[in-house]
């Protein structure tokens, strides 16, 4: 074990914590922990226009939810510009950089000319070797790196092998802008050196940047960290991952009902392997992780595998833990809706306006759990799942798990057991209820009312009797009954639901018709 290993995760806070970025963070975390080293976090927020506090918080919360705890204080590049400026001036003094006074308009003119001539554009500044005595005083210069004209740069990548790039293909990149702020290239190199980074593990979309950064390393005389550029994640169709494939933020996967343990396991296997092992705990991942087992081909995002893994991790949780998670989601989302519905009171009891507000809120539901509160009821100040309902959910858990791969699916089914809240009817179940034989439902209510024993066997036998008496198949009468009791067209066994909820609750739901 090498406890001198220091890795870093360095996202730009311009959006959510992307699933590909989360995998990069995971690999850096595991490599550092495997070697008893340090995993550092750096926020690359030099782009003031695009960086947001919300994105920073999304990065923090996403990493914490995944269990990827970092060492030490978070480094913010926006607070380190003086360090970058000093570094640029040092290169200037050592003849490794120069002031460039070429206006941006002239650079763009040259770029356009090269494009028209179908030539690769590399800007060659006329100021590279000019004497400071002729520097203009009316133009604020940038500081550019004096990249060697001859020779080449070799990236020694642990995964990609040796990548050689001719120096003639590398421009004299800007290190310090005219306003005194550092560019990304300078800041990254200075930070990695200052933070003592020993290993850089990142996506291979940074491979081109690596050559330019190596030129800066050489100019400073810094030791170059070990570099590993991993293939990007692709969609199931092999195309570059995009939103249509599921390139969502980690927060979205959390809201979709994935467990952090299962998502980490899935991301780990997305480009890394340990024999035929599919289920890998975080402890095992730390013990086993190495760079030699990384794949060279792009991994494909596969929701079927993700769901299968998540289903496994759901079943590893005990009943109390699962129920607690379900109750938390139910209460959070019910209370979100109550907050939105609360403003309805401003309409002074105007039913038409109230109805309109209610419809808007239904369409605005963003959690995947849509709730329905009749306009006639008085809104509670706060929703809370009762102890009785918690007991129902715990009792039903085995049958709920069989039909669920995510916490969200579990929670949707668990709503069946909220006896103090109105049933939510799917569109299909509404159609079944509207078209069912109302007299048959009344007959079912009468027969179930007479039952003294209300266990699932007794309830099932009673339904068989009713079906036979009406010359119907059991399934024919269970469709409307299921719709009325659950609001769904597919659910756990109605007979089991009946036993758990009891006669009073079942009759109450059947009588809605």
From Swiss-Prot:
Binding residues for ATP:
243
Q: Could you provide one GO biological process annotation from this protein's UniProt record?
A: glutamyl-tRNA aminoacylation
Q: Which GO terms describe its molecular function?
A: ATP binding; glutamate-tRNA ligase activity; tRNA binding; zinc ion binding
Q: Write the Enzyme Commission number(s) for this entry.
A: 6.1.1.17
InterPro entries (UniProt xref): aa-tRNA-synth_I_cd-bd (IPR045462), aa-tRNA-synth_I_codon-bd_sub2 (IPR020751), aa_tRNA-synth_I_cd-bd_sf (IPR008925), Glu-tRNA-ligase_bac/mito (IPR004527), Glu/Gln-tRNA-synth (IPR000924), Glu/Gln-tRNA-synth_Ib_cat-dom (IPR020058), GluQ/Sye (IPR049940), GluRS_core (IPR033910)
- Quick one: a GO cellular component term? cytosol
Q: Which cysteines are joined by disulfide bonds?
A: none
Q: Which family does it belong to?
A: Belongs to the class-I aminoacyl-tRNA synthetase family. Glutamate--tRNA ligase type 1 subfamily.
Q: What is this protein called?
A: Glutamate--tRNA ligase 2
* Species: Rickettsia rickettsii (strain Sheila Smith)
């Amino acid at each position: 074990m090498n406890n001198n290993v220091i890795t870093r995760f360095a996202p730009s806070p311009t959006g959510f914590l992307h699933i590909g970025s989360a995998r990069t963070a995971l690999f850096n975390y595991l490599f550092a922990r495997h070697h008893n080293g340090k995993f550092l976090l750096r926020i690359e927020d030099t782009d003031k226009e695009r960086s947001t506090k919300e994105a920073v918080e999304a990065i923090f919360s996403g990493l914490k939810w995944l269990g990827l705890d970092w060492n030490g204080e978070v480094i913010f590049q926006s607070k380190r510009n003086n360090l970058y400026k000093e570094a640029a001036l040092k290169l200037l003094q050592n003849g490794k950089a120069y002031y460039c006074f070429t206006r941006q308009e002239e650079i763009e003119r040259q770029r356009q000319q090269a494009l028209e001539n179908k030539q690769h554009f590399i800007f060659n500044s006329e100021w590279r070797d000019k004497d400071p005595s002729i520097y203009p005083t009316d133009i604020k210069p940038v500081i550019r790196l004096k990249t060697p004209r001859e020779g080449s740069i070799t990236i020694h990548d642990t995964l990609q092998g040796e990548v050689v790039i001719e120096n003639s293909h590398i421009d004299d990149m800007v290190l310090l802008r005219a306003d005194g702020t550092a560019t990304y290239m300078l800041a990254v190199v200075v930070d990695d050196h200052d933070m003592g980074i020993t290993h850089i593990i990142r996506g291979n979309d940074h491979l081109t940047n690596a050559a330019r950064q190596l030129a800066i390393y050489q100019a400073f005389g810094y030791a170059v960290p070990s570099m590993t550029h991993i293939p990007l994640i692709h969609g199931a169709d092999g195309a570059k991952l995009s939103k249509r494939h599921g390139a969502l933020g980690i927060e979205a996967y959390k809201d979709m009902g994935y467990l952090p343990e299962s998502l980490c396991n899935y991301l780990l296997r997305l480009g890394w392997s340990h024999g035929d092992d599919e289920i890998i705990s975080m402890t095992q991942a730390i013990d086993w992780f190495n760079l030699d087992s990384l794949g060279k081909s792009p991994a494909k995002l596969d929701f079927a595998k993700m769901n299968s893994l998540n289903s496994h991790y759901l079943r590893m949780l005990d009943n109390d833990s699962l129920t607690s998670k379900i109750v938390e989601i139910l209460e959070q989302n019910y209370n979100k809706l109550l907050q939105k519905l609360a403003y309805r009171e401003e309409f002074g009891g105007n039913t038409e306006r109230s109805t309109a507000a209610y419809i808007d809120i239904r369409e605005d539901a963003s959690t995947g759990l849509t709730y329905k509160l009749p306009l006639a009821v008085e809104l509670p100040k706060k929703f809370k799942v009762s102890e009785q309902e918690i007991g129902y959910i715990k009792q039903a858990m085995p049958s709920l798990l069989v039909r669920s791969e995510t916490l969200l699916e579990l929670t949707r089914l668990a709503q069946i057991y909220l006896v103090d809240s109105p049933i939510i009817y799917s569109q299909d179940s509404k159609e079944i209820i509207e078209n069912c034989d109302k007299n048959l439902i009344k007959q079912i209510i009468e027969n179930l009312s007479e039952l003294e024993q209300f266990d699932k066997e007794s309830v099932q036998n009673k339904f068989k009797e009713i079906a036979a008496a009406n010359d119907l198949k059991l399934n024919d009468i269970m469709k409307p009954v299921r719709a009325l009791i659950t609001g769904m067209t597919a659910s756990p066994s109605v007979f089991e639901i009946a036993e758990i909820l009891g006669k009073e609750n079942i009759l109450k739901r059947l009588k809605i018709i």
